[in-house]
Amino acid sequence: MEEKELKNGYTTGTCATAAVKVALEALIYGKKATEVDITTLNYTNLKIPVQKLRVRNNFASCAIQKYAGDDPDVTNGISICAKVQLVKELPKVDRGAYYDNCVIIGGRGVGFVTKKGLQIAVGKSAINPGPQKMITSVVNEILDGSDEKVIITIYVPEGRAKALKTYNPKMGVIGGISVLGTTGIVKAMSEDALKKSMFAELKVMREDKNRDWIIFAFGNYGERHCQKIGLDTEQLIIISNFVGFMIEAAVKLEFKKIIMLGHIAKAIKVAGGIFNTHSRVADGRMETMAACAFLVDEKPEIIRKILASNTIEEACDYIEKKEIYHLIANRVAFKMQEYARADIEVSAAIFSFKGETIGESDNYQRMVGECGAIK
């Protein structure tokens, strides 16, 4: 039976942006939209239906129904809402994210951050940088130099209940869901379909250019980091969580060199010998980080803090001996090469959420030079 093509959806961040745009245009222009055009962070143009719009003298609110496509997302079908209010001066709100002409606040059903290590500071609403960027872009476009300022409250009526079915409580995001999105699009694929797609892409790259080396990255962060440091993105493939499968694919297609670029939160799993990095398959992040900390002679109290950390980013805050990242990069390269059981060489570089390279394997610079991987 031919496998059906799965439908993509849009993120909570895209929904929040759409709700802000509809509400603000209603308040300023009197426009009562039934659908709204949104351009996502990866420049995808969407036409999103409006679920509900309410306008009063000094504020407007809008609800957008979350659509996850064929992705198994617990937020699918819930309402993501925005209330906008025009003011002359922005009030002081502890949880708010402030910009020149607006403040973005998480209301009912949007979580707030209580632990370090996330992209949002402790005490702030769990509205990530990607959605904030989309929202402020819409506000700037609509206000277009006006002196007016906007109080934006994002709220999710079912958010508190839905959050209990996510990792938010464990991650220290309390009281609701997070408003997320690095691209604005939710890509849906079955595991088999995704693997077939990645193998086909890798095969084309091998046969089209006849190069025997490849760059692996876990996702969007890795791709952006590849661009930032000047590596040849035409030789880069996104491997998602499927490290082991893609190593096997590279061996089958007779690649001789793999350059692995990975965020520390994913790379640490590979350093521990985990070759499917999905959170439901295996974890061991803190344990592997603690073991590496022991090997570079970190203090016992730091190792205890690492083991008790909520995220790897938090654990990294405790690290004093930065050579740990060199060790981790070497472990990633070694474990991947060991897994391959073939005549293939692996090098690795790891980076932080800030996009800084924090560790390289011993052979990384040599391999990059030999491959001509710098554009």
Curated annotation (Swiss-Prot):
Family annotation (NCBIfam families): cbiD (TIGR00312)
Family to which the UniProt record says this protein belongs: Belongs to the CbiD family.
Catalytic activity: Co-precorrin-5B + S-adenosyl-L-methionine = Co-precorrin-6A + S-adenosyl-L-homocysteine
Entry's EC annotation: 2.1.1.195
Protein source organism: Fusobacterium nucleatum subsp. nucleatum (strain ATCC 25586 / DSM 15643 / BCRC 10681 / CIP 101130 / JCM 8532 / KCTC 2640 / LMG 13131 / VPI 4355)
Pfam families the UniProt entry points to: CbiD
GO biological process, one term: anaerobic cobalamin biosynthetic process
Domain of life per record: Bacteria
Pathway the protein takes part in: Cofactor biosynthesis; adenosylcobalamin biosynthesis; cob(II)yrinate a,c-diamide from sirohydrochlorin (anaerobic route): step 6/10
GO molecular function: cobalt-precorrin-5B C1-methyltransferase activity
UniProt KW keywords: Cobalamin biosynthesis, Methyltransferase, S-adenosyl-L-methionine, Transferase
Name of this protein: Cobalt-precorrin-5B C(1)-methyltransferase
